[in-house]
Amino acid sequence: MLRWIDQGTARGPTRPAGRAGDRSVQFNTAQRELTLKIVYYGPGLSGKTTNLRALYQRILPQLRGHLMTLDTADDRTLFFDTLPLVFTAGTLKVKLKLYTVPGQVMHNATRRIVLQGADAIAFIADSQPSKRQENYKYWLNMVENLKANGLDVDSMPNVVQWNKKDLGDASTQEAIEKMRKENRQPVYEAVAVRGEGVVETFLGLVDLTFTQIDKTYLLSQKIGLDRRAFVEEVRRCLVDPPVPGPDGKAA
């Protein structure tokens, strides 16, 4: 269980690990197809959609589907965003379906629905000191909604990304370092609007996710696809970011 650092002291709730519910991971042995659902969760305006947009820019055009978004006038996600990625790893056809959830309090029912069948979660926290309590609140909300879907945060791959790192302060860095020492979840720092830390967060979660499903489907034994090879295939789906010109814009 993640020991969430709320203003440097508070921790996440302690509760017995629940059963893992039905996830959406689909492995078609006959056609050798694997489908995974990854959800980006977190407070409103923490950078969930920004992460997906940054990934969209990095994925090879021939491998990515359409990035579907439905935003309100103030650039908040109204329902959810989805970004499909389809590629081949060894002899396996892989479909990664990336989702975000709306952050506004009023859309909790939608967040619960989007979490149905999730295989992995990236929790996007806001590094601004004023958002510390809100981060904690939404972590608890995520745990509750997972439980409502028969899922348990302790038994599924998940990472934490502290986004807007450029807007944090010394207390934020202290909280991040403390979280890294006390929790099993990998913790990443990012400035998603500049694309920094986005790919690292994504690949880190992909790594954890494959490790989890390999225990169930024994992919490394059955088709000779191990964790390193899988992550490397995902990495090959990405292109390098454009190099900034003298004016700071992409050349």
Q: What is the role of each PLM region?
A:
Residues M68-M106:
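Switch I (G2) and immediately adjacent beta-strands of P-loop GTPase domains
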Residues N108-P129:
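Inter-motif core of Ras-like GTPase G domains
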Residues K97-T100, A122-D126, V160-N163, E189:
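Conserved beta-strand segments of the P-loop GTPase G domain that flank and frequently precede/overlap
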Residues E196, D207-A251:
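C-terminal-of-GTPase-core extension/linker across diverse P-loop GTPases
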Residues D166-L218:
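Canonical P-loop GTPase G-domain recognition
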Residues L45, Q104-V105, Q128-S130, K164-G168, ...:
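Conserved nucleotide-binding/hydrolysis micro-motifs of P-loop NTPases
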